[in-house]
Amino acid sequence: METTLTNQLVDIVFGLSDTAIEVPALGLRIPILELLHAILINYTYRTALKQSHAEIGWAQGLLATVVMSAGGGSTSALLLGNPLGILKSNRFWGIYGATYWLMFSNPYFYQFLQYLFAIPMMEQLFTAADGILRTSAVVNGGVLAVANNKDLGDDKWVAKIICGALSGCGGGLWTDAFRLSSAQWSFSTPRLLRTASVDMKASFMTALFYTAATTPALCEWFDLPILGPKEAQAWSAVVLSGGLIYRTYVTRWQQKKLELPEEEKKDQ
């Protein structure tokens, strides 16, 4: 039963990761998960700006969304002395740049997304895509990047967990530190360092789980079955996506709590 479930999970996670829109005329292949992630990042950024979206410059907004999208993996790469992944991918700039342009060049695309995200479970669908992509960053840009680093190696468990966790939530850390989701940027101590966010906790648990599940010695300590790389990544995607989806509900509950006093004041 466990083997069957794991195999099905591997097929789903990696099947979604491989799904893409083919554009033969242009010779393009656009991965669905990357497109959904780009839309989610830009929509979240545009929503956070509220009315101040008209005050930001094009370069400022693009840089903010790039940090939000790839800040985690880039932070891990810098720590390990590796080239930034976004510099090795023309596709990244095409997908995220085009999505950013659509979001801020006219009001209609954002209004359409507002309608789309109002549909039940739609936000969770985009968030699940975000979770699968982040898991790939945790695994490839964090844990495996440490294992393949000649100066570190496969036995550096702490480095794996740190770089893996940063790959999953580093973008949010930089966004919070420099207030990138506002029109005026300023540096201050990241609030996430005082109170860990759901993203940080989920990313940390994902890095810890993957490292433990693929390391025989750690499996013995945590009493876990040893998993292959694909199996461990698939279950890690469940852990991270589950945490991020939970965050969407928490955020919604908090918003409703804030709206209730305002409605009561209006009634009075």
What are the language-model segments listed below?
Residues 109-189:
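Membrane-proximal helix-loop-helix units in multi-pass membrane proteins
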Residues 23, 153-268:
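C-terminal transmembrane helix-loop-helix hairpin of multi-pass membrane proteins
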Residues 45-48, 138-145, 248:
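Transmembrane helix-loop junctions and nearby membrane-interface residues
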Residues 11, 33-40, 61-71, 89-107, ...:
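Mid-membrane cores of alpha-helical transmembrane segments in multi-pass membrane proteins
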Residues 57-63, 120-124, 191-196:
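The feature identifies polytopic integral membrane transport proteins across all domains of life
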Residues 1-93:
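N-terminal topogenic module of multi-pass integral membrane proteins
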